[in-house]
Each structure stands twice: as C-alpha cells, then as structure tokens.
C-alpha cells in the first residue's frame, strides 16, 4: 500500500509538472496603460448597459437597424461560424468521454484444402465495445480548452460585427437626415432668393437701384439653385444607396424610408468607467479568447509529445448456430500505449510552431488593447466637444429666434 501511494504521488507530480511545463515558455501579455483616460471619466453607469433600441429611440431607425441585422450577409456568415465553432467545441468535449459502439455480424467461410474436401465455417455474433483514452498529459483537456476559447472568440466577433453594423446604419441614417434638412433649407433659401430677384428687378426698373444690384441678386439665386442637384445626388447615392447596401436590398427595390423630422436625444449619455468600457468591448474579448486558444494550442502540442494510453472493453456473443448464440458469450479488455519514438523532430517543431502562434496572438492582443484604449479616449473627448458645440449652437439659435 505504501509503495502504491508512492507511485501515485510520483505519477501525480509528473502529470502536474507536465501540465505546468506546457505553458511555462508562454510569456504573459504586457499592457503599459495609463491609470485613467485623459478625459477622466468616472461615470458609474455606461452606455454599454443601454440597448441600441432604447438609446436611439427612433422607430424608423430601430426598424432599419433590425432589418439590417436580419439580412446582412456578413452577419449571417458570422452567425454560421458561431454555430460551426459550437459544434466543434461539442466534439472536443465529447472526446474526453468513453466511446460506445455496437456491431452485429455474420459470415460464412468455405475452405478447400488441397482440393480434397470443403469445410463450412459459419459465424454469427453481436458485440458491444467501450473505448476510452486516459488523458494522462492533458491532450484532451487542452483540446477542449482550445475549442471553448475558439467558440467564445467567434461569439465575440459576431457581437463586434453586430455593434459595428448598428453604428454604421445609425451614422448613415443621421447623415441622410442632415442632408434632407440641408436640402430643405436650401430650397427655402432659393425661394427667398427668388423674391430678392423679383424685388431687385422692380427697384432697378423703377430707377431706385443700379443694374449691378439686380445682377448680384440673380447671381445669388443661380448659386443657390446650383446646390440643389448636388444635394439630391448625395441623398440618392451617398445616403439612400449606402443604407440599402447595408440593409441588404437589391438594386430593384426602393430604399428604406425615413422621417425628415429632426431627431432629438434627451439627456447626457453615460460614458462609463474606462476599465469597464475596455472589458466590455467585443473586439477586445475576441482577441483575449484568441489568446487563450493559442495558449491551449501550446498545451496540445506539448502533450502530443508524450505516450497516449487507450483502453478498450469488448463483450458479446458468438456462435456458428443462431439458436445457440447466447451459449457462447465472450469478453476481453485491451490496453494500448502509443508513444512517439523517432519522428525527425516533427513533434518538437509542432510545439515550437504553437509557441510562435501564441506570441502572435499575444502581440495582437497587446496591440488591440492599446488601440481600443486610444479609441475610447478619443471617442470620449470627441463626444464631449461635440456636445458642447451643439449646446452653443442651440443657444445661438434660440437667441436668434428671440
């Protein structure tokens, strides 16, 4: 018993050492980030807690976004990839469990020895088997971890694409509304210029003003009229067709409709704490899961260098006569060890390649975090500046009305 306990402890220590050794050469990511954003945001709530349908509050825009998400080809492809990775992850999880199989067979063998006589040897049987690989070095455990990380990465990539599409559709929608408003203002200005031309003509014909005043009014009218075709082209090409392309409409369909009324968003948008914003970014999460998958890939490659132990348990019945088939049961246990002996460095090269893949994923993760940190800082500063500018313009408008 004491000797068995010693062997068990030694074996456990060997397994633990192998598991730790698998990733000991993997360098942890280095993130040299400032303690806080330049903007100094400390909101306890965040925009990430608000659904896009609540944030925009525009029925036409929300319908357009939803239909875009339902029809966009990239979104559909990303959803299919998520399903693919989910099923592959199920395969990796099932690999750690025993494999059950069953077989029913029958054959009849005829032998002719030296052309003297024929002998018939019928055989009927049924058997079931259970095979299981003992995960000594963590091959299957690392493979499961790798599959899970790849599945989660695909989910985060889908969420990142969804977030990008929502932002793109909303941006194009508001740009289109701005063009509509600009066109409306230009048309109103054109009508004013037409009245100015009429009055300038009357004054000139009455001798009250010189001809240059009348000609100047005509120039201003023509200049304003020239703006309308360009604005209509922008609305058609840059606005409606861009929305239709993202929406997934064919060229024969009409572009989605939108109201011309001015959109209002009440209240200040809660930005949130920088660390929370970084943690909840889908692209950051996807990069982090890709890093975890690469780390698990190192573990798989490392464990693949060691022997693999398989057990098979088979039992059944077999007889040459069907009526007596249950009189001859059988069973056996088979164990096998498969060990790499000499492969000209293939296993070591595979392990080194996995380490290089991990380094790539680590550097991409570090780069992504730095990029997102800067994007978040710039977005917060831009949002505050634009909001202050809008408030000042609204004050000027109110003062002009008064």
Per-segment meaning from a language model:
Residues 140, 149, 156-273, 386:
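Periplasmic alpha-helical coiled-coil/stalk elements that build and connect Gram-negative outer-membrane
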Residues 76, 96-120, 131-160, 180, ...:
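Small/polar (Gly/Ser/Thr/Ala-rich) solvent-exposed segments
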Residues 124-130, 172, 273, 331-337:
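Hydrophobic, lipid-facing positions within transmembrane beta-strands of outer-membrane proteins
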Residues 231, 282, 361:
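Metallo-beta-lactamase
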Residues 2-70, 232-279:
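Terminal intrinsically disordered/low-complexity segments used for targeting and assembly
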Residues 77-92, 161, 167-187, 195, ...:
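Amphipathic alpha-helical coiled-coil segments
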Residues 60-105, 119-122, 129, 133:
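Intrinsically disordered, glycine/charged-rich N-terminal periplasmic/extracytoplasmic linker segments
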């Amino acid at each position: 018993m004491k000797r068995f306990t010693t062997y068990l402890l030694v074996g456990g220590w060997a397994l633990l050492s192998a598991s730790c050794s698998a990733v000991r050469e993997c360098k942890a990511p280095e993130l040299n980030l400032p303690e806080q954003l330049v903007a100094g945001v400390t909101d306890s709530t965040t925009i990430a807690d608000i659904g896009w349908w609540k944030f925009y509050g525009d029925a036409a825009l929300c319908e357009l976004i939803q239909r875009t998400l339902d029809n966009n080809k990239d979104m559909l492809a990303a959803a299919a990839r998520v399903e693919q990775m989910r099923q592959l992850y199920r395969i990796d999880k099932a690999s750690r469990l025993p494999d059950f199989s069953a077989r029913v067979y029958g054959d009849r063998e005829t032998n002719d020895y030296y052309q003297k006589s024929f002998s018939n040897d019928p055989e009927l049987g049924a058997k079931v088997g259970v095979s299981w690989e003992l995960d000594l070095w963590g091959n299957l455990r690392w493979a499961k971890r790798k599959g899970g990380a790849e599945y989660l990465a695909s989910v985060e990539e889908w969420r990142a694409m969804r977030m990008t599409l929502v932002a793109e559709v909303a941006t194009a929608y508001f740009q289109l509304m701005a063009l509509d408003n600009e066109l409306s203002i230009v048309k109103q200005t054109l009508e004013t210029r037409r009245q100015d031309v009429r009055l300038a003509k009357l004054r000139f014909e009455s001798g009250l003003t010189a001809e240059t005043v009348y000609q100047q009014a005509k120039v201003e009218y023509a200049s304003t009229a020239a703006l309308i075709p360009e604005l209509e082209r922008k609305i058609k090409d840059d606005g409606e067709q861009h929305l239709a392309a993202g929406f997934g409409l064919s060229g024969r369909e009409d572009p989605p409709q939108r109201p011309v009324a001015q959109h209002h968003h009440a209240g200040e948008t809660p930005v949130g704490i920088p660390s929370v914003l970084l943690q909840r970014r889908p692209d950051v999460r996807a990069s982090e899961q890709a890093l975890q998958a690469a780390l698990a890939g190192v573990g798989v490659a490392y464990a693949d260098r060691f022997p693999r132990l398989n057990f098979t348990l088979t039992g059944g019945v077999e007889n040459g006569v069907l009526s007596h088939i249950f009189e001859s049961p059988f069973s056996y246990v088979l164990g096998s060890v498969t060990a790499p002996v000499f492969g000209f460095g293939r296993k070591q090269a595979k392990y080194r390649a996995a380490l290089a893949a991990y380094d790539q994923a680590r550097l991409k993760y570090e780069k992504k975090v730095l990029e997102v940190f800067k994007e978040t800082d710039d977005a917060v500063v831009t949002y505050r500046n634009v909001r202050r500018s809008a408030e000042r313009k609204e004050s000027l408008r109110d003062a002009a009305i008064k």
